[in-house]
Amino acid sequence: MEAYIRQKRASPGMVQASDLQINRPMSGMRSNSRELHAYDGPMQFISSPQNPDQILTNGSPGGINPVAMNTSRNHSNNMRSLSTINQEADLIEEISSHELEDEESSPVTVIEQHQQSASHSANSTQSQKPRARQHSFSDNLDEDDYTNRNVAGAAPVRPAGMASSPYKDATLDGSSNGTGNGTGGESEGDVIGNIDQFVMQPAPQGVLYKCRITRDRKGMDRGLFPIYYLHLERDYGKKIFLLGGRKRKKSKTSNYIVSCDPTDLSRNADGFCGKLRSNVFGTSFTVFDNGNKESTESPRLDLAVIIYDTNILGFKGPRNMTVILPGMTEDDQRVKISSADPKQQGILDLWKMKNMDNIVELHNKTPVWNDETQSYVLNFHGRVTQASVKNFQLVHDSDPEYIVMQFGRTSEDVFTMDYRYPLCAMQAFAIALSSFDGKIACE
């Protein structure tokens, strides 16, 4: 009997003390055996991970449910993977929406009127810091877009103070103090006639045009080429569109198209007014009208040349710029100068040869160093509110109190631009665009 029981227990059909079991063939035709990795019967639940009666103990490893461990581990891995994916998505979104800020965008300390007077008297007794005009190249770069480069050396120019009313003194309204133009109170200009003709017409004497430039960073090609819009400011917050400008994509040097049609900023558009073109280093810019370079009937005319002083030594200081304009006739019209005409010289060639008969040379007004704010300051009479390396005022050496043009920042993407005789809107807007462009060898 005992031998029979031992033989029976040794038969393949019985439960063995192992998880490897060779099952008995179910039929004679199926001679291949099957492997069962489990216990057969109630004993299965004792060793099974899914034992419903199992008591889990935190102290012993054997009391931890393997399924719970695997589930917890998988859940933790999934949460970690999800967190990593979210972090990568946030990083990509941050990079895609990230906009390079100006290095010079720093808090502005507004000087009160009595402090401004005291600072002015103190600065008048001290020697003013000289203008460093270096004519060489450096690798300091500019900021504005992903395609543009970053300024490293130019110091921001801060507004010197807020006047009770803009352009109240001789600097801007020509009131008689011995230095102004003697025009008395100036009137604010308005658009006369068609836009395309108005933007090319020199400003009348005694008229001031207050404008605003808005920078659209989205622009074209995912923000690599911002679009700039020029509006004439009117009362009660109203504004009139004048010009739009954008940088051309496929150009060896910086090349801006300027148009009076905001919906079509192309060279073939009906509203095409002119263009701004720079040299390789971004130190010299030439403004042209919409004339044809090859045409003899309506040749392309030079409207202005903007030259930024180069700086190889990295001196900290505001930008130094020179603007050369065509001279004015007795009836307040521009002298026609064309570098495309082989019979005459362009504005830049005339300036290099010191032939100043038919051209006018302007310079940016030298800012004054303020020891209290530790910055360069200019009085923009409330029109500029933020420090920026782009802030400037253009004057003529013979009359430094007559501000031909001023440009400066009021917010991250909004700038004010005011101009008067002898500039036109096209010239002033192009000068402002040159300030936005990257400059390899400046600052």
Swiss-Prot record:
Gene Ontology annotations of biological process type: protein localization to cilium
Biased composition (Polar residues): 68-80
Membrane topology of the entry: Peripheral membrane protein
Compositionally biased region (Gly residues): 177-186
InterPro entries: Tubby-like_C, Tubby_C, Tubby_C_CS
Spans annotated as Disordered: 57-80, 98-191
Pfam family name, one: Tub
Location in or out of the cell: Cytoplasm; Nucleus; Cell projection, Cilium membrane; Cell projection, Rhabdomere
PROSITE patterns: TUB_1, TUB_2
Keywords: Cell membrane, Cell projection, Cytoplasm, Membrane, Nucleus, Phosphoprotein
Modified residues (Phosphoserine): 136
Keyword Transit peptide: no
GO CC annotation, single: rhabdomere
Keyword Transmembrane helix among record annotations: no
Composition bias, Low complexity: 113-128
Major site of localization recorded for this protein: cytoplasm
Stated family: Belongs to the TUB family.
Protein name as it appears in the record: Protein king tubby
Organism whose genome encodes this protein: Drosophila simulans
